[in-house]
């Protein structure tokens, strides 16, 4: 088939690589426009755009993909199907109608669970034991279209969102390729999503990533892992905003929620249940470091609290 691949961030790369090596022809890549990134705020292409250019594939970067001008441009490519992995924009019916076999999205959850922009983070924060990836035919409503296929993935007790997403990106790439094969062969029929079990995973704001120390230790552990690496779980300690990496549970210590206790080798923070031990932290404007090293340098006293 003639395919346009729509995607933007690094987790979309395994899928693009699989399709470039497949029996299908990737005639163009649709990705978000260049954005400013890094400390110098220099303009940078998306990871998907960079990979496409390495392979000599045309790159399309419309700021408004639903505008009539781009709808006409896509129609001129005479594509059979569009494959989508984390493109980053909602698509309107006029654009969805262009390819004769529609738009197929790879979503990193077992739909209808965790529709939306942050399914991996939501599954870890909720304490799910199993998640996966789903290919489905895109409809105007958010992540609601009929399903072509799924793969499952177990969530380990130490998984961060970054680690889990990395595995799903790889297994999902194989699912997307097999879905494209099945559609071309006429061997796949999309099945409507279940009515029950719908949950929503909206984009996470920086404020939502803040740690609420009154919660139980296990919930805080899941929250921190769900926010790692982006946007990063954070708190204020001694007047400094600090990102917090995955933690350990200090079952022999009881501290009031948010109370900080600096030990020789550990920094403990009280929760709604047992205390937790911080491992790595990143104070605002500084590099990642061991929590104990930071605490010594910051000279935290016995009265400090995490807020």
Curated annotation (Swiss-Prot):
InterPro entries: Fmt, Formyl_trans_C, Formyl_transf_N, Formyl_transf_N_sf, Formyl_transferase-like_C_sf, Met-tRNA-FMT_C, Met-tRNA-FMT_N. CDD domains: FMT_core_Met-tRNA-FMT_N, Met_tRNA_FMT_C. Disulfide bonds: none annotated. One of its GO terms (cellular component) is cytosol. Gene3D superfamilies: 3.40.50.12230. (6S)-5,6,7,8-tetrahydrofolate binds at residues 109-112. Its EC number is 2.1.2.9. It catalyses: L-methionyl-tRNA(fMet) + (6R)-10-formyltetrahydrofolate = N-formyl-L-methionyl-tRNA(fMet) + (6S)-5,6,7,8-tetrahydrofolate + H(+). Pfam families: Formyl_trans_C, Formyl_trans_N. It comes from the Bacteria. It is an enzyme of class 2 (transferase). One of its GO terms (molecular function) is methionyl-tRNA formyltransferase activity. Keywords: Protein biosynthesis, Transferase. The keyword Metal-binding does not apply. PANTHER family: METHIONYL-TRNA FORMYLTRANSFERASE, METHIONYL-TRNA FORMYLTRANSFERASE, MITOCHONDRIAL. Belongs to the Fmt family. Attaches a formyl group to the free amino group of methionyl-tRNA(fMet). The formyl group appears to play a dual role in the initiator identity of N-formylmethionyl-tRNA by promoting its recognition by IF2 and preventing the misappropriation of this tRNA by the elongation apparatus. This is Methionyl-tRNA formyltransferase. The gene is fmt.
């Amino acid at each position: 088939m003639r395919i346009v691949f729509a995607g933007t961030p690094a987790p979309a790369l395994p899928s693009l690589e699989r399709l470039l090596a497949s029996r299908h022809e990737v005639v163009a890549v649709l990705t978000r426009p260049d954005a400013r990134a890094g400390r110098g705020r220099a303009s940078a292409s998306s990871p998907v755009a960079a990979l496409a250019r390495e392979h000599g594939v045309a790159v399309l970067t419309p700021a408004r993909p639903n505008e009539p001008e781009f709808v006409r441009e896509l129609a001129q490519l005479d594509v059979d199907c569009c494959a989508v992995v984390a493109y980053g924009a909602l698509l309107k019916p006029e654009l969805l109608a262009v390819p004769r076999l529609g738009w197929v999205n790879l979503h990193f959850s077992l739909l209808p669970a965790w529709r939306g922009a942050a399914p991996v983070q939501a599954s870890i924060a909720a304490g799910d034991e199993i998640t996966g990836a789903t290919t489905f035919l895109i409809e105007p409503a958010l992540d609601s279209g009929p399903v072509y296929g799924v793969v499952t993935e177990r969530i380990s007790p130490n998984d961060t969102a970054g680690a889990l997403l990395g595995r799903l990106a790889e297994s999902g790439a194989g699912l997307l390729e097999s879905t494209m094969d099945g559609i071309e062969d006429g061997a796949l029929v999309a099945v409507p999503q279940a009515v029950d079990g719908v949950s929503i995973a909206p984009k996470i704001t920086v404020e939502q990533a803040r740690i609420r120390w009154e919660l139980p230790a296990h919930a805080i552990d899941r929250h921190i892992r769900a926010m790692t690496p982006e946007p990063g779980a954070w708190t204020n300690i001694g007047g400094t905003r600090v990102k917090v990496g995955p933690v350990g549970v200090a079952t022999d210590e009881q501290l009031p929620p948010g109370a900080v206790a600096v030990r020789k080798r550990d920094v403990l923070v009280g929760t709604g249940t047992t205390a937790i031990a911080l491992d790595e932290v990143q104070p605002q404007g500084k590099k990642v470091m061991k929590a104990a090293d930071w605490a010594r340098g910051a000279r935290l006293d016995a009265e400090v609290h995490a807020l």
